[in-house]
A protein has these predicted regions:
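Long, contiguous binding/interaction regions
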Residues: 1-207
Length: 207
């Protein structure tokens, strides 16, 4: 079980910088984001949606939308990355990740709005994910993608992931990376708050 306290989701928000210097706000998705999230997925190109879900969909089915917004359920989390566009907070990327405690691993999937490709948003999200995964006491992160998804494969390779054959589907490839974030750096809110929570729950804290 994770040490995250999810009563106030906004405390786990992070402010990142893209490769081009833009401010990227990363926060957990909330029920109030239902329409925004659906609009985001509808605005993706057909290819981007296919690459994200390994199938043809035009929007999130009702059940999957519920899962995306039910942050923390079964140790699954969804974050949205937003930027100010024409004066409005706009979702430009999303990432969903799940903790597999039995293997100390976090599995993830992500997408970036086609109009914002090339800004380094996915790279920033992956770096942030390492910290979020470490807060869950994971030791490595992994993802899967279609062998035809050259963009994701290139991103994973540049981000230091090792590639292995998928155990169940020849059309997919799996990539895995050992988490190399130093605890002393505390580069994200999730890690800092998890550390404080463990400290407060330790026997020495109440002695």
């Amino acid at each position: 079980m994770s040490t995250l306290r999810l009563e106030d989701l906004r405390q786990y928000s992070d402010s990142l910088r893209t490769r081009q210097g833009e401010t990227l706000n990363v926060r957990f998705a909330e029920p109030r984001n239902t329409e925004e999230l659906q609009h985001y997925f509808r605005s993706l190109s057909t290819r981007s949606r296919y690459n994200r879900f390994f199938g043809a969909i035009s929007e999130l089915p009702k059940g999957l939308l519920h899962d995306f917004l039910d942050v923390g359920e079964r140790e699954r989390f969804t974050v949205v990355a937003t930027m100010m566009v024409d004066g409005f907070e706009t979702i430009v990327a999303e990432m969903r990740y799940a903790l597999h405690a039995e293997t100390a691993a976090v599995e993830f999937g992500l997408s970036v709005d086609d109009r914002w490709h090339g800004h380094g948003i996915a790279t920033a999200l992956l770096k942030n994910l390492e910290c979020r995964a470490a807060a869950l006491r994971a030791e490595h992160i992994f993802g899967e993608t279609l062998r035809s998804n050259e963009t994701m494969i290139s991103l994973a390779r540049k981000s230091g992931f090792a590639f292995v054959n998928h155990p169940d589907d020849w059309k997919l490839v799996r990539f895995d990376k050992k988490i190399a974030v130093a605890p002393k750096d505390i580069p994200c809110a999730s890690w800092r708050l998890a550390a404080l929570s463990r400290q407060a729950d330790s026997p020495s804290a109440s002695a």
